[in-house]
Amino acid sequence: MGIKERNAPSQYKQSSRKNKRAWRKNIDLEDIESGLEQTRDEEIKGGNVEHKPNDALFVIDTLGDDRIAKRSRKKIKPLKVDQILENKSSIEKVHSHLTNNSTESNKKGKIFSRKELNRLQALVYKNKDGLTATSAASELKNTKQPKESYDVWETNPTVTIPVKRPSTLSKLPESLTENNAKVPNVVIADPGMSYNPDAAAWMKLLDTKGSEELKKEQKRISELEEKERIQKKAFEDKGLVSDQDVNHSIDSDDQSEHEQAETPIPSSKNKRKTRSQRNKIRQRREEELRLLEQKKNEELLRTIDKAPAISKKLQQKDKAEKFSNKAVSSSTTEIKLKKKKFGKHRLPNNPLEIKLGDELTSSLRELKPEGNLFADRYLSLQQRAMVPPSLPVLKKSKYRAKIKEKYSHKDFHLQKNSI
């Protein structure tokens, strides 16, 4: 076999640098990358310094350097001789009092006696009337009022505290009624509450009070049903059965012994609506809104046509209200409260004071009174925000009740045998 020829190793081919693609590929980006890295570091450290305001970069120093203050406060070290001669005793020395008889001080002329000083001041500050400053001052001193004296040994000193008028007395109480209507002190009762009422007034009052009581009863029943439903749901979630369900199931088993047919149980989960169903619901809603708007516009056009007649009726009504009896109007109107709560508790409702058909009497001798005048006055005070509503407080014992075993427990066996 012949020897194979070995070619030279292939050299690195440099890519052509004539087109723009090669320029982008082989360009040097070290400066740009270093700049981006620098901006990244500045953002990590708190942001670019050039774009920050002066308040974020500089602070006005109002305290100063503590080291300079300490250096200025530092005392000059005294000499050793002065330190030895310094008085280090904690007891003060006895000062010598200067007297008026001291000849040296008088000779030097530095210290005057009190009498000499008063004489010189009188010569200098002499008034036209002849009064001196010292005499005027002494007169003022004598005219001062003497201090009040009191007995130190008094056992029960009488201290008089001045009574302060509260600021709330000058303010009106908060109005609890709608439109800040004034609540009368004594509300006149409805004509239907009379012992011998008019038939129409009595029937009207009976209808209003009966509808109110019916609403209260319906509300109470609905709350009770909702409570039972929640309780039943809680039992079902836990996998238990309530007592009512057990009794109901026993009764239903007794009744359905002869019935074999089973009704399918509908699924409680709501099915997802399709797009067409949602579109139909939306279109129906839009159509209802359009019809409602059209109806409102038609009614508005009708009222515009009847505007003169309506204005005439309103004027007649205003005239009738002006000439009507104020007492009757105030008695028939019922007080409407805008706030049902004043303080911690709710305002109590007006008591139901009405006679039924079998309770109506034609004479005062057979009349059974309804309500209480004291309770009515107190309720009026609460409605006028003069007295806050409260609940009756039960009387509590001062001491806690203790459970104690009686001595008769030892005769338990005897009682058991006797039984």
Swiss-Prot record:
One of its GO terms (biological process) is ribosomal large subunit assembly. GO terms for molecular function: 5S rRNA binding. The modification Phosphoserine is found at S242, S249, S252, S256. Residues 1-21, 233-283 are annotated as: Disordered. The keyword Phosphoprotein applies. Residues 269-283 have a biased composition (Basic residues). It is found in: Nucleus, Nucleolus; Nucleus, Nucleoplasm. Residues 233-261 have a biased composition (Basic and acidic residues). Keywords: Nucleus, Phosphoprotein, Ribosome biogenesis. InterPro entries: Nop53/GLTSCR2. GO terms for cellular component: nucleolus; nucleoplasm. Belongs to the NOP53 family. May play a role in ribosome biogenesis. This is Ribosome biogenesis protein NOP53. It comes from Schizosaccharomyces pombe (strain 972 / ATCC 24843) (Fission yeast).
